[in-house]
Amino acid sequence: KRIEEKTDTLGLHFTQPTIHEYGEYVYISMAGINSWLTNPDEPQLPCFMTTLSYPLGTRIDAVTYAIETPQKITLPKQIIPLSQPLPLDRLYHSSKRLPSSRIYNETSPYPGDYMSYQITVGLEDNQPVIFLSLQVYPFQYYPKINRGEYIQDIEIEISYKPASKNLNMPDIYDLLIITPALFSDNLQ
């Protein structure tokens, strides 16, 4: 029996970015985001994260996206880098913002793509499932020329083949021990 491929579509909308002054830097906000890129010394950029779940045994074949032509925006200052994490102790520590030369001297965009994803396996409601975690980056930053590009709409398409049968795991397992033949007599 041939399993038909299915497609899920997720459409997201973001507003035009707002530029906020922050000392010698700026930061960007956009309605429609729910998180930020949080890598120390790298630009603090808006992002949207969501996780979808599929029954165990589902094969995710492709995750693609479509966007309109990105809009360009010139920034008055560099985007603020995230500070280094501070230790959890009772001493005073000043937060340091050290722009990563690896990123801030680049002519290519950061983070580099409008979407990334990971496929993992875990439990949801105590049942094994496939998790598809999506990260959408509606703002791309060109640090060397202090310019940004942003999108307001993205359509994500997930192509997958559903599980061919229910892969529920039994509650009781037999014990399987894999060992060299040298030890097999001791295990019996």
Functional labels for PLM-detected ranges:
Residues K1-Q188:
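Extracellular pro-sequences of secreted precursors
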